[in-house]
């Protein structure tokens, strides 16, 4: 390995270690409200604010935009910590990272939004899944049409994390004039876009605080496609496969891994501390437990 490559790898390792250490340092604070967030379906605003204060909301963005330019490994390890501390916060964070990375890579001219996102001043998310498409989140029945005033969007999106609470949404719809569910175009819609409404509530175990709800679009106007459209017409599927899917899979896997680790830790602590009153023995002293 050449000295220059070795130096680059060493720098990347230091950045990754710093990102993970920063995330670990606030894990207890993230976990403090996790139970209440889930029980009351409370959106983890304070946790998202804390991540922003620590400079983590731009984890994947380049340094020139205020980001950390973190590696995939640092992202996964950090998300695992966040998800294990508060599952709802973990999912909100992952969807935000996926959305802002998509905007960064495929929508020029959004430096202001991206800098705000990195600073924790702008929360973004994805709105791609639909009730009828199952795991095929890239397949869209939602439509777009050209009008005299611009482009209008119609359809419904399911499982929109941070629904009604994010500042912007990366939305997928069929390309203009297309009848194909995978010939799609992506748009960034601001939270106050006319014709965009939200409904329902999410009842996912441990994830009730992430506001993963339904987005309804009714004649939703895109007056300036040049500033709202992500990539070219019909490029949605390509962007979803190349940019969104890898980060979505890595991020959600890390969240659920963190949840599993937290559940295991809680279970171990329970058998170590639970005492049987009639014998005075702890659960972990029982043969059936020790043999597991």
Model regions and ranges:
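Alpha-helical interface subdomain recognition
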Residues: 2-77, 253-292
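Glycine-rich flavin
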Residues: 43-53, 58-161
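Buried hydrophobic positions in well-ordered alpha/beta secondary-structure cores of metabolic enzymes
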Residues: 78, 153-155, 187, 217, ...
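Short loop segments at secondary-structure junctions
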Residues: 106-108, 147-149, 174-178, 191-194, ...
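Conserved hydrophobic/aromatic beta-strand scaffold that supports enzyme active sites
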Residues: 141-143, 168-172, 186-188, 214-219
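Short beta-alpha junctions and helix-cap segments that line functional grooves
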Residues: 156, 199-203
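A short core secondary-structure module
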Residues: 159-197
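Glycine-rich beta->alpha junctions and the first turn(s) of the following alpha-helix
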Residues: 204-292
């Amino acid at each position: 390995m050449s000295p220059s490559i070795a130096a680059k790898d060493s720098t990347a390792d230091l950045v990754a270690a710093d990102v993970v250490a920063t995330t670990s340092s606030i894990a207890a604070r993230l976990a403090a409200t996790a139970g209440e967030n889930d029980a009351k379906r409370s959106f983890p605003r304070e946790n998202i604010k804390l991540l922003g204060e620590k400079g983590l909301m731009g984890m994947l963005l380049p340094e020139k935009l205020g980001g950390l330019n973190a590696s995939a490994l640092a992202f996964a390890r950090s998300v695992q910590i966040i998800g294990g501390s508060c599952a709802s916060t973990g999912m909100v964070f992952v969807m935000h990272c996926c959305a802002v990375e998509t905007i960064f890579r495929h929508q020029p001219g959004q430096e202001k939004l991206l800098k705000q996102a990195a600073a924790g001043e702008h929360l973004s998310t994805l709105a791609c899944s639909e009730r009828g498409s199952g795991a095929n989140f890239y397949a869209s029945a939602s439509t777009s049409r050209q009008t005299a005033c611009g482009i209008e969007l119609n359809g419904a999106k399911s499982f929109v994390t941070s629904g009604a609470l994010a500042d912007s949404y990366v939305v997928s719809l069929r390309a203009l004039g297309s009848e194909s569910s995978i010939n799609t175009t992506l748009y960034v819609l601001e939270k106050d876009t006319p014709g965009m409404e939200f409904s329902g509530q999410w009842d996912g175990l441990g994830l009730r605080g992430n506001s993963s709800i339904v987005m309804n679009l009714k004649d939703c106007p895109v007056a300036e496609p040049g500033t709202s459209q992500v990539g070219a017409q019909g490029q949605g599927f390509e962007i979803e496969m190349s940019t969104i899917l890898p980060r979505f899979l890595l991020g959600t896997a890390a969240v659920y891994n963190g949840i599993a680790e937290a559940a295991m830790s809680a279970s171990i602590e329970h058998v170590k501390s639970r005492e049987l009153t009639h014998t005075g023995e702890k659960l972990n002293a029982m043969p059936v437990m020790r043999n597991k």
